[in-house]
C-alpha cells in the first residue's frame, strides 16, 4: 500500500504529465531502446514508428496517476495489458528496466527533485507487482491446462488459404504432434517471427477464427500496406514452414448462456474474432437470437462470406446483414450485400430490442466509435457492449 504522502506527490504531477502528453513516452522509449536495444526484439516497432504505442503508454501512466487511490478501477485495463504481455513473454526483470527508464525520463524532462522521483518509484513498484503477479497466474494457467505450454512452441503451417483480396487464413498444427490448449472465442495467438532480412524479431497477435478443436489453430491475416509481418506472411510463408506460437490469451471473449441473445458487429478483418464466436454458437446449437452485422469496402475484400452463411444456417434464430461502402457493379449483379454505404443499425433496431442481448464489436477504431454510439442512442446499455482494438488499446 502507498502512504498518503506518496499518493499526494504523484497526483501533484498530473498537470505536468497532461501538459507534456506523449512527448513523455516518446522520450522514454527513445531512451530505453538506446540503452537496452535487446528490447527491440520484443516491442512492436511498427507501433513505435506510428506513435500508437507511445500514446497508449502515456494514457496508461496518466490513468494510473489519476486513479492511484482507487486501484480497483484500473483492474480491467490491467487485465487487458497483462494478457497482451503474456503473448510477448514479459518477465519480472523487464519491469525493473522499464522502471529505471521511466524515472530517468521524469528526471531528464522535468528535474522534479528526489521526493517526486522516490514517490513515482514507489508507485511504479506497486503497479509493477500487480502486473507481475497477474502475468504469473496467466503463465501458470496456460502451462497447466490440457494441451498448454510454457514459452513458445513450434507449429507448422498445414494450410494457407486466400479468403479475399486482402485476407489469407493460416492453419497451424504443433510440430510435436501433441494436443493444443483450448481458448475462449475472441482470444488471440502470439506469433513470433524472425525471417531472413528482418532486423528484429517481430511479435504479433492474431485472432483465432474458429471454435477450439484440440488439434490446431486457425488465424486470418490482413495484408497491411507497409506491414512488415503481414506482407511476409502473405508473400513468403508457405505450407510446411514452422513458426513459433505463444499460448492463446486475451481479455476479449464471448461467454454467454444458451438463452442469451448475441449480436456480432465487425468491419473488415475485425470479423476474425467474431468468426470464432459464431462458430462456437453454431456448434453449441445456440437457441437465442444471433445477429451477424458486417461492413466491408466491397466484394473483393469481403472474406469468409460462405462460411458465415453456412454457420448461420445451423442456428435456429440467425439474422445477417452486410454493408458494402463502395460496391462494384459485379457486387450489385451478384447481390452479395444487403445495404450500400456505412453501417446504419437504426434500420435493424427490431433485431436487437432484447435488453439482455450482448454486443461484440471489432474493427477500425472509428468504425467501433460510430457503431457503439448508434447502439447507445438506440438504448443499449454500455455494459452490454464489448469491443476489441487491434493494436494498442483505445477507449471508444
UniProtKB/Swiss-Prot annotation:
Monomer. It comes from the Bacteria. The record marks 29 as: Involved in heme-bound ligand stabilization and O-O bond activation. One of its GO terms (molecular function) is nitric oxide dioxygenase NAD(P)H activity. This is Flavohemoprotein. The record marks 84, 388 as: Influences the redox potential of the prosthetic heme and FAD groups. It comes from Escherichia coli (strain K12). The active site is at residues 95, 135. Its EC number is 1.14.12.17. InterPro entries: Cbr1-like_FAD-bd_dom, FAD-bd_FR_type, FNR_nucleotide-bd, Globin, Globin-like_sf, Globin/Proto, Hmp, OxRdtase_FAD/NAD-bd. Residues 1-136 form the Globin domain. Heme b binds at residue 85. NADP(+) binds at residues 268-273. FAD binds at residues 188, 204-207, 389-392. The keyword Transport applies. Residues 147-396 are annotated as: Reductase. One of its GO terms (biological process) is nitric oxide catabolic process. The keyword Aminoacyl-tRNA synthetase does not apply. Binds 1 FAD per subunit. Binds 1 heme b group per subunit. Residues 150-255 form the FAD-binding FR-type domain. It is found in: Cytoplasm.
Amino acid at each position: 500500500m502507498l502512504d498518503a504522502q506518496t499518493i499526494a506527490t504523484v497526483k501533484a504531477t498530473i498537470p505536468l504529465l497532461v501538459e507534456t502528453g506523449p512527448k513523455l513516452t516518446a522520450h522514454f522509449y527513445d531512451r530505453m531502446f538506446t540503452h537496452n536495444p535487446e528490447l527491440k526484439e520484443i516491442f512492436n516497432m511498427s507501433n513505435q514508428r506510428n506513435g500508437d504505442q507511445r500514446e497508449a503508454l502515456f494514457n496508461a501512466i496518466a490513468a494510473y496517476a489519476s486513479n492511484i487511490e482507487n486501484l480497483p478501477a484500473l483492474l480491467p485495463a490491467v487485465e487487458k495489458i497483462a494478457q497482451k504481455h503474456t503473448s510477448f513473454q514479459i518477465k519480472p526483470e523487464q519491469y525493473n528496466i522499464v522502471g529505471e527508464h521511466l524515472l530517468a525520463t521524469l528526471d531528464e524532462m522535468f528535474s522534479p527533485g528526489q521526493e517526486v522521483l522516490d514517490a513515482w518509484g514507489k508507485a511504479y513498484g506497486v503497479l509493477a507487482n500487480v502486473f507481475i503477479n497477474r502475468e504469473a497466474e496467466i503463465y501458470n494457467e496456460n502451462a497447466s491446462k490440457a494441451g498448454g505450454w510454457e514459452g513458445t512452441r513450434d507449429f507448422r503451417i498445414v494450410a494457407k488459404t486466400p479468403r479475399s483480396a486482402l485476407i489469407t487464413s493460416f492453419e497451424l498444427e504443433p510440430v510435436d504432434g501433441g494436443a493444443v490448449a483450448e481458448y475462449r472465442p475472441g482470444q488471440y495467438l502470439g506469433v513470433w517471427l524472425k525471417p531472413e532480412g528482418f532486423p528484429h524479431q517481430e511479435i504479433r497477435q492474431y485472432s483465432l477464427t474458429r471454435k477450439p478443436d484440440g488439434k490446431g489453430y486457425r488465424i486470418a491475416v490482413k495484408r497491411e500496406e507497409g506491414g512488415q509481418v503481414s506482407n511476409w506472411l502473405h508473400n513468403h510463408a508457405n505450407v510446411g514452414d514452422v513458426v513459433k506460437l505463444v499460448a492463446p490469451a486475451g481479455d476479449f471473449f464471448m461467454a454467454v448462456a444458451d438463452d442469451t441473445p448475441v449480436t456480432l458487429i465487425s468491419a473488415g478483418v475485425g470479423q476474425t474474432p467474431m468468426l470464432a464466436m459464431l462458430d462456437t454458437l453454431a456448434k453449441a446449437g445456440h437457441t437465442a437470437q444471433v445477429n451477424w452485422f458486417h461492413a466491408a469496402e466491397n466484394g473483393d475484400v469481403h472474406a469468409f462470406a460462405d462460411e458465415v452463411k453456412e454457420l448461420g444456417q445451423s442456428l435456429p434464430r440467425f439474422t445477417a446483414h452486410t454493408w458494402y461502402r463502395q460496391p462494384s457493379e459485379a457486387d450489385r449483379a451478384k447481390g452479395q450485400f444487403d445495404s450500400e454505404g456505412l453501417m446504419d443499425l437504426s434500420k435493424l433496431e427490431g433485431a436487437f430490442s432484447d435488453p439482455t442481448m450482448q454486443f461484440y464489436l471489432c474493427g477500425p477504431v472509428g468504425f467501433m466509435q460510430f457503431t457503439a454510439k448508434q447502439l447507445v442512442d438506440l438504448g443499449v446499455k454500455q455494459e452490454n457492449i464489448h469491443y476489441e482494438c487491434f493494436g494498442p488499446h483505445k477507449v471508444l
